[in-house]
C-alpha cells in the first residue's frame, strides 16, 4: 500500500511540475519594481527596516527567525496547529501533496521573478548588518530580495489552505500574512519586497487553479480534510436568482495591520504618495483614473475586455459576463467590515481638498478608506478572468494594478488602502472556490471561452471523465490515446491496454 502511494505521489509530482514552464508569469508587467534609492518608497523601506529591528525577540514575533527557513517543513509546522491536523505524507497525503507542489512551483516562480528585476541587495547586505538568522546569511546574500520569497510563499500557502479548511480561514490568513512581516523583522527583506511578494502570490493563485490537475489535487485535499475533521468545507448553491454568491462567511480582514496613524512614519509615506500621484491628474493617466471611479460590473467587463482578449458582454460572452457580474456583487462584506472597523478617513476629507472626480465626494465623505473597495473589485475581476484565460494573466493584472492606483490619483484612497485591497481580493477569490455555484459558473465560462458549449468527454478507465489525460512525462494527450500504456488522469493512474 505504501509503495503504491509513493508511486502515485511521484507520478503526480512529475505531472504537475512538468507544467511549470508553460505558466511562469513575467511579473515585470504588473509589479511596480524595486524602488529607486532617492524615492519615497525607499525612505519607507528604511523606516520599516529600523522598525523591524526594534521588534526582534519580542513575544509577538518569536516566530520571525524560524519563518526564514524556506522549506516545506517550515510551512507545515506553522500551519498544522492552526488547521488542527498534523500535516504529513502519511497522515494527510493529499494535503501534503498540494503543499509540496506549491512549494516546488513557488520556488521556480520566485526565482524567475527575482531574475527579471535584477539584483536588489538585502538590508543586511546593504548595511553590512546581521539578521536574526546569521547561519543562512551567506545563502541569501547573492540572491535578489525583490520580491520577497518569504512573503510570497506565506501568502500563497495561506490562500491555498483556506480553500481546503475554510472554517479556519481567518487564522490561516493571519499566519500567512505574518511570514512577510517576519522577513522585515529578521532583516532579510525590505517592505517593498514584501508588498510585491504578497501581490505575486495573488497572481499565482489563479495560475495554479488554471491547471485541471491542480484542481483535482485540491478536490482530494478538501475531501481529506472533511473526512478527517467531519467539517463540511463546501458552500452549497444559493438562490440562482440572487445577484451575488453566498457571502455571509467571507474571510474577515482581521489579518490586515491597522492603517498608519497620523503620527507614524508610514503615514508620511502615504502622504507623499498622495502628493506625487495627484500631480498626474492632468495627464492621460489622470483621465483614466477619473473613468475608473466606476466599479460596476459593466465597467469591469469593459476595461478588462482588451486584456482578456475577448469582448465580455451579455450578448457575446454571456457566461463570462454573468460570472463577472455575480462576482462583482459578492465581495463588499469582506472590505466593508474592515472599513467600519478601522474608520480611516479618505485623503480628500482629511486634507480638506478636492478630488479629481467631485461627484462622489459626498458619498465617500463618511466612508472608511481602508482597505480600498475599488482595488478589491478590480483585482478580484482580474483574478477570475485570469483563471479562465491564464495566457493573458499578466495583462489582466497590469490593468488591475492600474485600476487600484487610480484611486490614489483621484484622491479617494491612500496607497496603503490600495495595497490592502488586492489582498482582500485574493482571499475572496479563494473563498469562492469553496462555493458550488461559483465552480459551476466558472466551468461554463471556461467552456465558453474555449469555444465549447458542452463538457468534452475525456478518457479514463470508463472513457467518460471530464479530466484531461497526460503521459507520465507530463505531455497532455489530445483526443484518444494512440498507444497503450500508463497515463495519469486527475489523481489516478490509468492503464490503457
Positions of predicted regions on the chain:
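Bacterial Sec-dependent N-terminal signal peptides
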Residues: 1-19, 237
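Surface-exposed, short loops/turns at beta-strand junctions within beta-sandwich domains
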Residues: 480-483
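Residue-level detector of functionally pivotal "anchor" positions at catalytic/ligand-binding pockets or at interdomain
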Residues: 452-473
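C-terminal tail/sorting-segment detector
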Residues: 486-497
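Hydrophobic alpha-helical bundle signature of multipass membrane enzymes
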Residues: 19-186, 207-213, 223, 227-410, ...
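Short acidic/histidine-rich active-site segments
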Residues: 188-192, 198, 411-416, 422
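Catalytic phosphate/nucleotide-handling subdomain of diverse soluble enzymes
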Residues: 202, 426-428
Amino acid at each position: 500500500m505504501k509503495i503504491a502511494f509513493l508511486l502515485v505521489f511521484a507520478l503526480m509530482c512529475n505531472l504537475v511540475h512538468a507544467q511549470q514552464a508553460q505558466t511562469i508569469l513575467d511579473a515585470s508587467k504588473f509589479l511596480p519594481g524595486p524602488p529607486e534609492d532617492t524615492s519615497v518608497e525607499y525612505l519607507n523601506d528604511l523606516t520599516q527596516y529600523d522598525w523591524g529591528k526594534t521588534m526582534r525577540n519580542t513575544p509577538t514575533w518569536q516566530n520571525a527567525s524560524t519563518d526564514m527557513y524556506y522549506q516545506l517543513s517550515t510551512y507545515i509546522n506553522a500551519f498544522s496547529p492552526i488547521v488542527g491536523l498534523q500535516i504529513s505524507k502519511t497522515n494527510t497525503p493529499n494535503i501534503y501533496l498540494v503543499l509540496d507542489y506549491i512549494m516546488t512551483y513557488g520556488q521556480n516562480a520566485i526565482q524567475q521573478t527575482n531574475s527579471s528585476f535584477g539584483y536588489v541587495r538585502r538590508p543586511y547586505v546593504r548595511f553590512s548588518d546581521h539578521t536574526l538568522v546569521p547561519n543562512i546569511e551567506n545563502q541569501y546574500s547573492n540572491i535578489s530580495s525583490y520580491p520577497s520569497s518569504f512573503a510570497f510563499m506565506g501568502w500563497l500557502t495561506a490562500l491555498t489552505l483556506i480553500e481546503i479548511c475554510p472554517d479556519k480561514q481567518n487564522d490561516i490568513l493571519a499566519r500567512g500574512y505574518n511570514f512577510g512581516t517576519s522577513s522585515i523583522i529578521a532583516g532579510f527583506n525590505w517592505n517593498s519586497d514584501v508588498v510585491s511578494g504578497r501581490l505575486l502570490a495573488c497572481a499565482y493563485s489563479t495560475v495554479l487553479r488554471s491547471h485541471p490537475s491542480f484542481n483535482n489535487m485540491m478536490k482530494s485535499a478538501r475531501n481529506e480534510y472533511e473526512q478527517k475533521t467531519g467539517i463540511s468545507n463546501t458552500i452549497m448553491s444559493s438562490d440562482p436568482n440572487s445577484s451575488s454568491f453566498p457571502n455571509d462567511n467571507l474571510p474577515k480582514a482581521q489579518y490586515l495591520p491597522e492603517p498608519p496613524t497620523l503620527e507614524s512614519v508610514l503615514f508620511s509615506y502615504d502622504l507623499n504618495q498622495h502628493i506625487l500621484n495627484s500631480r498626474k491628474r492632468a495627464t492621460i493617466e489622470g483621465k483614466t483614473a477619473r473613468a475608473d471611479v466606476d466599479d460596476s460590473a459593466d465597467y469591469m467587463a469593459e476595461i478588462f475586455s482588451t486584456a482578456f482578449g475577448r469582448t465580455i458582454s451579455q450578448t457575446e460572452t454571456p457566461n463570462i459576463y454573468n460570472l463577472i457580474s455575480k462576482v462583482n456583487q459578492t465581495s463588499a462584506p469582506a472590505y466593508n467590515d474592515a472599513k467600519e472597523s478601522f474608520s480611516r478617513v479618505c485623503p480628500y476629507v482629511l486634507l480638506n481638498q478636492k478630488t479629481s472626480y467631485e461627484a462622489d465626494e459626498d458619498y465617500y465623505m463618511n466612508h472608511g478608506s481602508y482597505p480600498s473597495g475599488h482595488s478589491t473589485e478590480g483585482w478580484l475581476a482580474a483574478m477570475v478572468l485570469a483563471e479562465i484565460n491564464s495566457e493573458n494573466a499578466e495583462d489582466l493584472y497590469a490593468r488591475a494594478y492600474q485600476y487600484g492606483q487610480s484611486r490614489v490619483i483621484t484622491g479617494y484612497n491612500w496607497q496603503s488602502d490600495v495595497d490592502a485591497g488586492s489582498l482582500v481580493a485574493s482571499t475572496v477569490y479563494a473563498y469562492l472556490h469553496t462555493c458550488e455555484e461559483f465552480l459551476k459558473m466558472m466551468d461554463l465560462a471556461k467552456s465558453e471561452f474555449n469555444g465549447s458549449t458542452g463538457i468534452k468527454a475525456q478518457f479514463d478507465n470508463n472513457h467518460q471523465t471530464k479530466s484531461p489525460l497526460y503521459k507520465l512525462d507530463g505531455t497532455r494527450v489530445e483526443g484518444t490515446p494512440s498507444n497503450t500504456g500508463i497515463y495519469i488522469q486527475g489523481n489516478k493512474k490509468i492503464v490503457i491496454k
